Amino acid sequence: MIDTPCPAFGRRFVVEASNSDPATGHGHERDNQADCEIHATRTATNQRARFFLRRGHWVEVYDDDTKELLAGPFDPDQAAPAYIV
């Protein structure tokens, strides 16, 4: 398999992992956010989102510039989606 990064043409993605459902408003409270990473490729973004889901975290993906929610929130108790970003 050839692993070629998928360029996002200058777009950066923020992967946020939290310990509770961010849709309830609790995901952004202190100590509920497990991690936050910024990636420049869709490939890296997808890999890290799946990494956090496998570890039981809720996951959301945002556009770093516009702060627009692009994907999620994904429930770690559900099957991972086939497409994230």
Identify the function of each model-found stretch.
Residues M1-D3, H39-R48:
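Charged, amphipathic alpha-helical segments
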Residues M1-R12:
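Non-catalytic signal-transmission and effector/linker regions of two-component phosphorelay proteins
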Residues A8, R42, F52-R54:
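Surface-exposed coil/turn segments at beta-strand junctions on protein surfaces, enriched
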Residues R11-D21:
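A short beta-strand micro-motif
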Residues F13-V15, A49, V59-V61:
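Hydrophobic beta-strand residues in large extracellular and virion-surface proteins
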Residues D21-H28, K67-L70:
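Short, surface-exposed beta-strand/loop "edge" segments at domain boundaries and coil↔beta transitions
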Residues G27-T43, G72:
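A short, exposed loop/beta-hairpin motif centered on an aromatic-Gly-Thr core
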Residues L53-V85:
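Short, mixed-charge low-complexity intrinsically disordered segments
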